[in-house]
From Swiss-Prot:
Lineage: Bacteria, Bacillati, Cyanobacteriota, Cyanophyceae, Nostocales
Gene name tied to this protein: cpcB
Membrane topology summary: Peripheral membrane protein
Sorted UniProt keywords: Antenna complex, Bile pigment, Chromophore, Electron transport, Membrane, Photosynthesis, Phycobilisome, Thylakoid, Transport
Task performed by this protein: Light-harvesting photosynthetic bile pigment-protein from the phycobiliprotein complex (phycobilisome, PBS). Phycocyanin is the major phycobiliprotein in the PBS rod.
This protein's name: C-phycocyanin beta subunit
Principal location class: membrane
Gene source species: Anabaena sp. (strain L31)
Subunit organization: Heterodimer of an alpha and a beta subunit, which further assembles into trimers and the trimers into hexamers.
Length: 17
């Protein structure tokens, strides 16, 4: 699992707030 994938998931969660 690369950081790129992790960042993508975090980005989605952050967008939801």
């Amino acid at each position: 699992m690369t950081l790129d994938v992790f960042t993508k998931v975090v980005s989605q969660a952050d967008s939801r707030g």
